[in-house]
Amino acid sequence: MIREERLLKVLRAPHVSEKASTAMEKHNTIVLKVAKDATKAEIKAAVHKLFEVEVNDVRTLVVKGKTKRHGQRIGRRSDWKKAYVTLKEGQNLDFIGGAE
């Protein structure tokens, strides 16, 4: 059993993009920014506990940070982890429904 304290730290924020909204409409999949060390089991448990929905599948990927310049200084943005969480049939979770 994963501790509740850890579950609250796993999910960072919803990832809002055109691709994410299309995935929600067509495949009932939400896209989340998650902790870089989070496992698929932790992500599934956190979504189930916090949003009270049934999770069907979790797919993850690490987004590599881009190299950025500010004048002569060269820096790099941090890598971050993204999770595609597919919900079971009949389950619904809408982050941006009221943002019109």
From Swiss-Prot:
Alphabetical keyword list: Ribonucleoprotein, Ribosomal protein, RNA-binding, rRNA-binding
GO cellular component, as recorded: ribonucleoprotein complex; ribosome
InterPro entries reported in the protein's UniProt record: Nucleotide-bd_a/b_plait_sf (IPR012677), Ribosomal_uL23-like (IPR013025), Ribosomal_uL23/eL15/eS24_sf (IPR012678), Ribosomal_uL23_CS (IPR001014)
Pfam families in alphabetical order: Ribosomal_L23 (PF00276)
S-S pairs: none
Transmembrane segments: none
Gene3D superfamilies in UniProt: 3.30.70.330
A biological process term (GO) from this entry: translation
Gene Ontology molecular function, alphabetical: rRNA binding; structural constituent of ribosome
PROSITE patterns: RIBOSOMAL_L23 (PS00050)
Quaternary structure and interacting proteins, as annotated: Part of the 50S ribosomal subunit. Contacts protein L29, and trigger factor when it is bound to the ribosome.
Described function: One of the early assembly proteins it binds 23S rRNA. One of the proteins that surrounds the polypeptide exit tunnel on the outside of the ribosome. Forms the main docking site for trigger factor binding to the ribosome.
Family, per entry: Belongs to the universal ribosomal protein uL23 family.
Stated name of the protein: Large ribosomal subunit protein uL23
